[in-house]
């Protein structure tokens, strides 16, 4: 919408709404992420019916941020005008284990368990009151460094797969995901600002939450003939904040999202797509693709029933392969040019076309 619609944007100094909104930037926010890790993975064939898998991983996470004055209000800055870096460094060990049982050739049953971690990039602010995982107030370093411990958790999953004569491929799984050390905003409180000495409203951020997600996934692929594949899938999940530790220092503050369906996540998703390749004749190796995806309504406010409506989009494509080396493709997204919102204030893409040429060596 607006004068920026269908405009070409410069990669060097992008201005989507130029000549309409001439805003001058005063400073740049510089961020740098670096992640490295070591891992080991192995699959063991116990016998012709049992297989086991195990893996271990050590991750090292580094994040830093700084600010700098910009040149002439544009998106350029001098390194000499940059502030000192504020840094977050953390590491974590995670693992995963799985077991597969094959009672007959067409069926396999599996179970898996794995752990995860997710670092927080939170930096100290004098306008925030910080509470640890026990609900106790603490004072982070003002010079940077880790404020909140990383989110940690685990995932457990069981599933089944059935394959028959290259005609049917079915898989289904049920999962449970647990998250600990979830950071929540518990409200505000008026206190004296350490920098200015004035009374200000401070946000209370607390690492007191525990959340979980449970759901299932189903997928079925059918090959009526060798040149046609039809696939359909269904997913359902329920994500909620399950527990919020009560703070002894601030007992009057609670989070209304406890045990309430989470916002920003669709509960049900569904997709179906088909691919057909002409096997012989003048148009041999010409392929057609058609797909449809459904997304359940996404709540932005569960209590007040505010949400983005459910959405169904259709995409299509043509592919032509020459001597198994060169592939020409034309994809059409949002085939029927449906108007929709990607999020509350972001308009979804209209019908759009993408052409590609690829070569396989």
PLM feature spans:
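Residues that define the transmembrane beta-barrel architecture of outer-membrane proteins
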Residues: 32-36, 89-93, 152-156, 212-216, ...
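Structural signature of Gram-negative outer-membrane beta-barrels, strongest in the C-terminal barrel
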Residues: 29-179, 213, 223, 275
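Gram-negative outer-membrane beta-barrel proteins
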Residues: 60-68, 117-123, 130, 166, ...
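Conserved C-terminal beta-signal and adjacent last beta-strands/turns
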Residues: 111, 259-361
């Amino acid at each position: 919408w607006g004068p920026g619609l269908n405009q070409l944007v410069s990669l060097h100094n992008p201005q989507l709404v130029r000549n309409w909104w001439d805003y001058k930037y005063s400073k740049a926010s510089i961020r740098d992420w670096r992640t490295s890790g070591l891992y080991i993975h192995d699959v063991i064939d116990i016998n012709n019916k049992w297989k086991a898998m195990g893996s271990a991983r050590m991750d090292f996470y580094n994040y830093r941020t700084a600010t700098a004055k910009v040149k002439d209000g544009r998106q350029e800055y001098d390194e000499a005008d940059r502030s000192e870096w504020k840094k977050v460094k953390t590491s974590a060990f995670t693992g995963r284990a799985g077991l597969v049982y094959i009672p007959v050739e067409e069926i396999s049953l599996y179970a898996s368990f794995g752990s995860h971690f997710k670092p927080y990039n939170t930096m100290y602010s004098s306008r925030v009151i910080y509470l640890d995982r026990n609900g106790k107030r603490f004072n982070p370093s003002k010079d940077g460094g880790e404020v909140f411990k990383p989110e940690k958790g685990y995932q457990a999953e069981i599933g089944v797969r059935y394959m028959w004569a290259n005609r049917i491929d079915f898989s289904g799984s049920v999962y449970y995901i647990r998250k600990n050390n979830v950071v929540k905003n518990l409200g505000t409180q008026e206190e004296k600002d350490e920098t200015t000495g004035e009374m200000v409203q401070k946000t209370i951020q607390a690492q007191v939450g525990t959340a979980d997600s449970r759901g299932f996934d189903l997928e079925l692929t059918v090959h009526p003939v060798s040149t046609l594949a039809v696939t359909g899938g269904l997913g359902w999940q329920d994500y909620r904040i399950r527990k919020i530790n009560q703070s002894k220092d601030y007992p009057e503050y609670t989070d209304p999202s406890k045990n309430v369906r989470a916002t920003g996540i669709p509960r049900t998703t569904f997709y179906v797509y088909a691919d057909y390749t002409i096997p012989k004749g003048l148009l041999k190796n010409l392929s057609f693709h058609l797909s449809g995806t459904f997304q359940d309504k996404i709540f932005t406010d569960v209590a007040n029933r505010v949400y983005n409506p459910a959405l169904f989009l259709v995409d299509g494509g043509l592919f032509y392969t020459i001597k198994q080396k060169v592939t020409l493709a034309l994809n059409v997204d949002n085939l029927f040019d449906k108007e929709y919102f990607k999020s509350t204030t972001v308009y979804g893409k209209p019908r759009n076309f993408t052409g590609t040429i690829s070569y396989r060596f």
